[in-house]
């Protein structure tokens, strides 16, 4: 499978959830999530992602509002992406702050992080209504899916503008190397080609890092990657500014 032209840039959206996780582990306001957003933007990040979960384990509604206010003057240059399950309070918050993009993600009880994309047999009536409501407010809608034909076609059926390919399986198979690595990339490339042929954009995220990203960024038609855990972990040793720049060096 032929990859993307290495000269074409892919947007980086920095997920700042882990900054809020660290803050909440102690209480108080340190480290500041908005300060982290400022540092990411100063380093050149063209996107910021948050995933405000119902239990508020990291990002809170207040964080979302504060980040939205900080990014408002930069709307033409820095995209804001809010991830989450389509629960009523989250959709109301998204409609309030009007990010560029809302990535709808299925949530399993007790999960630490997202573990799978939407199933193609998910009841779609309510989801279709949510997607249309967001799009009427000019909010792009992306659906978190596995790199398989059925969920990608389902995403198109329910009206998504983009899909976000769940990349944990790619990261695992990349680490295995050899034919396993090649087969994994080919499967994701085929998924991207299908989504593109259906008129949807392609995002990706989960366990992407500086080791596996150079290959993955050549994925055909890839628009954006959302990276949080690996980037924030690297920042502990290099500083946040340097960590963001290291990822941008791979993507641009």
Model-derived features: positions:
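Hydrophobic faces of well-ordered beta-strands that scaffold small-molecule active sites
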Residues: 10-16, 48-50, 78-84, 102-104, ...
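C-terminal helical cap(s) of enzyme catalytic domains, especially alpha/beta-barrels
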Residues: 176-181, 234-252
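Catalytic cores of alpha/beta
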Residues: 87-97, 148-158, 204, 208-222
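Alpha-helix-loop-beta-strand connector modules within alpha/beta enzyme cores
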Residues: 57-88, 122-142, 180-204, 210, ...
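Glycine-rich phosphate-binding active-site loops on the catalytic face of alpha/beta enzymes
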Residues: 46, 103-111, 162-175, 221-240
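Glycine-enriched alpha-helix->loop->beta-strand junction motifs that scaffold or abut catalytic
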Residues: 44-46, 71-73, 96-102, 136, ...
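Histidine/lysine/aspartate-rich catalytic loop segments that bind and position anionic ligands
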Residues: 109, 140-194, 198
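Conserved N-terminal beta1-alpha1 strand-loop-helix module at the mouth
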Residues: 1-85, 95-99, 154, 180-183
């Amino acid at each position: 499978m032929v990859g993307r032209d290495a000269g074409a840039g892919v947007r980086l959206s920095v997920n700042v959830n882990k900054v809020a996780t660290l803050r909440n582990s102690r209480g108080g306001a340190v480290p500041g999530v908005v300060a982290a957003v400022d540092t990411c933007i100063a380093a050149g990040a063209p996107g910021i992602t948050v995933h405000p979960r119902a239990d508020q384990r990291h990002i809170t509604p207040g964080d979302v509002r504060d980040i939205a206010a900080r990014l408002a003057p930069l709307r033409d240059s820095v995209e804001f992406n809010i991830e989450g399950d389509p629960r009523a309070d989250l959709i109301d918050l998204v409609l309030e702050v009007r990010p560029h993009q809302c990535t709808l993600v299925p949530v399993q009880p007790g999960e630490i992080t997202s573990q799978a994309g939407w199933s193609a047999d998910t009841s779609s009536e309510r989801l279709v209504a949510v997607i249309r409501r967001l799009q009427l407010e000019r909010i792009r809608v992306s659906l978190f899916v596995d790199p398989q034909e059925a969920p990608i076609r389902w995403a198109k059926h329910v009206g998504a503008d983009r899909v976000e390919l769940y990349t944990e399986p790619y990261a695992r198979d990349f680490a295995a190397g050899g034919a396993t690595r090649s087969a994994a990339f080919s499967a994701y490339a085929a998924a991207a080609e299908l989504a593109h042929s259906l008129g949807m954009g392609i995002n990706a995220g989960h366990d992407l890092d500086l080791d596996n990203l150079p290959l993955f960024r050549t994925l055909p038609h890839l628009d954006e990657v959302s990276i949080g855990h690996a980037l924030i972990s690297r920042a502990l040793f290099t500083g946040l500014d340097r960590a963001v720049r290291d990822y941008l060096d791979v993507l641009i």
